[in-house]
Amino acid sequence: MDLDLERGPPGPRRPPRGPPLSSSIGLALLLLLLALLFWLYIIMSNWTGGALLVLYAFALMLVIIILIIFIFRRDLLCPLGALCLLLLMITLLLIALWNLHGQALYLGIVLFIFGCLLVLGLWIYLLEILWRLGATIWQLLAFFLAFFLDIILLIIALYLQQNWWTLLVDLLWLLLFLAILIWMYYHGQRHSDEHHHDDSLPHPQQATDDSSNQSDSNSNEGRHLLLVSGAGDGPPLCSQNLGAPGGGPNNGPQDPDNTDDNGPQDPDNTDDNGPHDPLPQDPDNTDDNGPQDPDNTDDNGPHDPLPHNPSDSAGNDGGPPQLTEEVENKGGDQGPPLMTDGGGGHSHDSGHDGIDPHLPTLLLGTSGSGGDDDDPHGPVQLSYYD
């Protein structure tokens, strides 16, 4: 299993959360039943306790909510259970403040204000949890308004001191926490499923590397290979480097003028396929072992279709090279090698007989304009095509 460089090595899988013990569930259900009975007794009795009746009923409702959270969602006891416990302590403090006087009353009021601030902080923390779980701004606003609406209704119930109003307020508090529990149950489960990390799947970086390697291999397989064979000890005429700056292949050691060199270098930094020429330099400042071309270039590559010139002082073959399966290597001449065309195809054969159709083809052509009197066809041009 590959290591995730961003996440680090995967840790051990967390064991599934087991259900709570049957004894704890039974005890919680028993306490929930007793709390409901006590709450109904206070609400339905004719006890004239005034505002204390409302506070006792509200305290029992908070106990009921805590028991429900413990039974169904124990993992939410920290945010929701702590909020209910803090509200329960504030309710008990209000019941105690109802009969206090003097400095104890002032101290109780300070504690009450401090408790209200804690309740507000816990509620904001709970809304942040809902936001992280994917709640929209409208859902958060609805929970926020429902919370403050219940507080206002509780204050009204303390003022009215009516049993039916107290029953309505307590049920609204229960509905608020049940709505939060249900929302966190569904959205929290979906959030955990979306962010579950499956180690069996490849990492995105690994998948990218695999695809790039595959594309590189495909591009390498798609490249055309030009098969050539050398004549004697001379370098080949054509190679895989088809991007030489001179417009043609670079078949030998490169000269300072970035031209092809199949033989010793001349003083004019041009291509030479044989020893230095004893003849004077041409006016085009280039080396010329044959008739001068009008394009001021070296005419040492594949020559125009001229007859063989045996009087060349350098020993070069002045005629055009034959692209056959053999090339004669005369003394001192490191002329161009042959092209292996896979079946004895000729360079001037426009039909490409015997050539492998999957390999690129090197054609010889002329510029179409005449040069010197000895070279009526102009320089030879090399064409590369698939």
Curated annotation (Swiss-Prot):
Composition-biased stretches, type Low complexity, lie in 209-220, 251-267, 357-366
The record places the following residue ranges in the Extracellular compartment, namely: 45-51, 97-106, 161-163
Topological domain (Cytoplasmic) residues are 2-23, 73-75, 128-139, 185-386
Enumerate the residue ranges of region (Disordered): 194-386
On the tree of life, the source organism's domain of life is Viruses
What keywords is this UniProt entry annotated with? Activation of host NF-kappa-B by virus, Host cell membrane, Host membrane, Host-virus interaction, Inhibition of host innate immune response by virus, Inhibition of host interferon signaling pathway by virus, Inhibition of host RLR pathway by virus, Inhibition of host TRAFs by virus, Inhibition of host TYK2 by virus, Interferon antiviral system evasion, Membrane, Oncogene, Phosphoprotein, Transmembrane, Transmembrane helix, Ubl conjugation, Viral immunoevasion
Question: Where does the entry annotate site (Interaction with host TRAF3)?
Answer: P204, Q206, T208, D210
What is known about what this protein does? Acts as a CD40 functional homolog to prevent apoptosis of infected B-lymphocytes and drive their proliferation. Functions as a constitutively active tumor necrosis factor receptor that induces the activation of several signaling pathways, including those of the NF-kappa-B family. LMP1 signaling leads to up-regulation of antiapoptotic proteins and provide growth signals in latently infected cells. Interacts with host UBE2I and subsequently affects the sumoylation state of several cellular proteins.
Protein name according to UniProt:
Latent membrane protein 1
Phylogenetic lineage: Viruses, Duplodnaviria, Heunggongvirae, Peploviricota, Herviviricetes
